[in-house]
């Protein structure tokens, strides 16, 4: 039996099996190089009882027709690494905006933190009340990569997000959380090509880590474009302003879609409206510029299409989507 999980609530694999129940399974033992191949027919158990996995919403049962065992068929050999997780303690909590809170996490064992590349995220495990299994999430590292004392995770509270609600409502200074090594492929491009950082909402978090890195690169030109509903929901406003004020080579553009009365008093510079591809293109960042985009899926799709239509090559457009799976 194979468990199937909710994911994004679309059981695509099950749909395929209903149309054609034939399945092939392959299992690799990377320690010995063994390869086990199974073929058969599958049925879907829509309401599993006494499941071995309480997180599974469906079970796929396979009746095996044929088995092929191929010892040492694979040339690769892997070994399981031990102690892949470590305990981190919350040393600070900072409310960054109306819905985003930063958690500073320092190692309990006082050993050095694993390094990360700006743009990467930190996988964490959280034990929620009433659940036997830990909930796993990944949150972008929003602090400077040079900070060796603590990681900073900046999390948006979502009403339907079990983990984000727990972090905001229950996790306090002194509490511990389990974390894996930083990972992720949404990386700040190396070199000196101009960099355009484009974000909306909580998508600002990986961009902030990149902005810290750019501020320490004296020869790199950059632009930081961010969209928020209003000033109350604009996270890291002071921090970004501080990073760019002494660097004429870093441009800053802020957009509020629904500015309130406090915003209209003029303390902060902003443009009413949203971040659009045309506004990005108007920067004239140059033929070698790299474009980093992070935010809701619709936002990313719109910016990407606009940049492509404006002649920006696909290999210069990099993006990461934030959605319900990250809550």
Where are these regions (language model features)?
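Histidine-anchored nucleotide/phosphate-binding helix
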Residues: 141, 204-216
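Alpha-helix N-cap/helix-start capping motif
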Residues: 201-202, 297
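Short, structured beta-strand-loop surface elements
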Residues: 2-56, 66
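Reductase modules of NAD(P)H-dependent flavoproteins
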Residues: 222-327
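Intrinsic disorder at enzyme termini
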Residues: 69-81
């Amino acid at each position: 039996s194979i468990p199937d999980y909710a994911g994004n609530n679309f059981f695509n694999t099950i749909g395929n099996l209903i149309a054609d129940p034939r399945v092939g399974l392959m299992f690799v033992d990377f320690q010995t190089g063994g390869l086990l191949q199974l073929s058969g027919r599958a049925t879907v158990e829509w309401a599993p009882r006494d499941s071995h996995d309480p997180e599974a919403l469906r079970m796929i049962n396979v009746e095996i027709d044929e088995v092929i065992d191929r010892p040492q068929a694979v040339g690769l050999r892997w070994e399981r690494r031990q102690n892949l997780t470590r305990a981190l303690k919350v040393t600070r909590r900072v409310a960054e905006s109306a819905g985003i809170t930063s958690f500073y996490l320092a190692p309990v064992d006082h050993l050095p933190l694993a390094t990360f590349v700006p743009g990467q995220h930190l996988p964490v495990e959280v034990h929620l009340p009433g659940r036997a299994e830990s909930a796993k999430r990944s949150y972008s590292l929003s602090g400077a990569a040079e900070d060796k004392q603590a990681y900073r995770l900046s999390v948006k509270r979502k009403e339907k997000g079990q983990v984000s609600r727990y972090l905001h409502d229950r996790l306090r200074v002194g509490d511990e959380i389990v974390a894996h090594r930083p990972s992720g492929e949404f990386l700040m491009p190396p070199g000196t090509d101009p960099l355009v950082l484009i974000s909306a909402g909580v998508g600002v978090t990986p961009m902030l880590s990149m902005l810290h890195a750019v501020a320490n690169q004296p020869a790199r030109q950059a632009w930081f474009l961010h969209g928020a509903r209003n000033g109350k929901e604009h996270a890291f406003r002071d921090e970004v302003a501080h990073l760019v004020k002494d660097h004429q080579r870093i441009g800053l553009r802020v957009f509020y879609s629904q500015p309130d009365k406090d915003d209209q008093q003029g303390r902060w510079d902003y443009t009413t409206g949203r971040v659009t591809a045309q506004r990005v293109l108007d920067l004239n960042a140059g033929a070698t510029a790299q474009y980093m985009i992070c935010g809701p899926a619709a936002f990313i799709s719109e910016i990407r299409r606009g940049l492509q239509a404006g002649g920006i090559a696909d290999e210069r457009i990099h993006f990461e989507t934030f959605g319900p799976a990250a809550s």
